[in-house]
Amino acid sequence: MKTALRINTDFTTEILDLEADSLMQLQEAVGGLVQAVDLHDDLTLWCNEEGKLINGMLANVIGTHLYEKNFGMTDIIMGDIVFTGGTDDEGDNLALPTAWLVQLQELAGKLRTAYEAEAKFFA
């Protein structure tokens, strides 16, 4: 099993245990075909490849922000996303390192708190 982290568009998170052949699990987690984006040697973002084409799929603020930091504001990441570690020499996914797991969960928690406070303000 390889640890991964799903971050939903509402900033909630879920730790996933991916099997060795994790393609179907990744597709299920993002709701369709997957696209891998390497953000760092040990951090890969998985998103829905057709996210912008699916009616009703919301932007993922965290995914978009991390994409922008690496590649500039050239794309928007839509829908729920999954983070894994990089890949090994054979191209297989690696587990998400604990340091990334903690940082990403903290970021999602802070944004969820801010989002909920704003929602109450405008309610």
Question: PLM ranges: what are they?
Answer:
Residues M1-A123:
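Domain-length accessory/inserted modules outside core catalytic folds
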